[in-house]
Amino acid sequence: LQYMTDADAEAMAVYLKTLPKRDADPLPTSQARLQPSVMENGRKIYDTQCALCHGADGKGHPPAYPPLAGNQSITMASPVNSIRMVLNGGYAPGTKKNPRPHGMPPFSHILDDDEVAAVVTYIRVAWDNSGAPVAAAQVPELRKLLPE
């Protein structure tokens, strides 16, 4: 946004106002809470691989490390973005307010499909997040998209 002209920002605002409103009701509580073994495995992986940057409470350390607690992109109906971030990692662009962004490392070479599903499920339901659980069967299709 820092490189947009005022006219571009106004055009974007006008466009966004034309989009239909989303349902404001929270998603139903995830059934993952009923699967203690998945949640425990996901919590252990989170504690060892994610908590250093994103915090034990999921609040992160902005702007370098974004919060996962209450993060709408984590609780979207589709878990694709969350799975891909765990597999591929991610690197934010440098901006005026964040000139040296930190990146998230990929975990595709460390975690198997069950572990990816467990940690993503944990993140999607921990800290009162309201995302749905992720099945290990959802991971291989996205793993195939990894660059060689």
Which ranges hold each PLM region?
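A cross-kingdom feature marking solvent-exposed beta-strand/loop segments within repeated
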Residues: 1-3, 64-74, 101-103
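Flexible coil segments in periplasmic/lumen-exposed cytochrome c-class electron-transfer proteins
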Residues: 1-52, 94, 98-148
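Sequence/structural segment immediately N-terminal to covalent heme-attachment motifs in c-type
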Residues: 34-63, 70, 75-88
